[in-house]
Amino acid sequence: MAKKNKARLLVKLLSTAGTGFFYVRSRPKAAPKLAFIKYDPKIHKRVLFEESKMK
């Protein structure tokens, strides 16, 4: 079995439109917080997704 890479984190990208829709991505631990403009299917628009805590 392969070893997991400990230098990366799984992060949740939550929609700033307030719909509750999210994407899960991985990023290096040393990198700054992620923010992307991606498609939110609940409102049928592209909106900003910002990193939030995974539960």
From Swiss-Prot:
Keywords: Mitochondrion, Ribonucleoprotein, Ribosomal protein
InterPro entries, per the entry: Ribosomal_bL33, Ribosomal_bL33_sf, Ribosomal_zn-bd
GO biological process, one term: mitochondrial translation
Compartment(s): Mitochondrion
Pfam family, one: Ribosomal_L33
Main location: mitochondrion
Any one GO MF annotation of this record: structural constituent of ribosome
GO CC aspect terms: large ribosomal subunit; mitochondrial large ribosomal subunit; mitochondrion
Superkingdom: Eukaryota
UniProt similarity note: Belongs to the bacterial ribosomal protein bL33 family.
NCBIfam families the UniProt entry points to: rpmG_bact
Primary role: Component of the mitochondrial ribosome (mitoribosome), a dedicated translation machinery responsible for the synthesis of mitochondrial genome-encoded proteins, including at least some of the essential transmembrane subunits of the mitochondrial respiratory chain. The mitoribosomes are attached to the mitochondrial inner membrane and translation products are cotranslationally integrated into the membrane.
Subunit structure as annotated in this protein's UniProt entry: Component of the mitochondrial large ribosomal subunit (mt-LSU). Mature yeast 74S mitochondrial ribosomes consist of a small (37S) and a large (54S) subunit. The 37S small subunit contains a 15S ribosomal RNA (15S mt-rRNA) and at least 32 different proteins. The 54S large subunit contains a 21S rRNA (21S mt-rRNA) and at least 45 different proteins. bL33m stabilizes the tRNA acceptor stem in the E-site.
Name assigned to this protein: Large ribosomal subunit protein bL33m
Organism: Schizosaccharomyces pombe (strain 972 / ATCC 24843) (Fission yeast)
Gene name as annotated: mrpl39
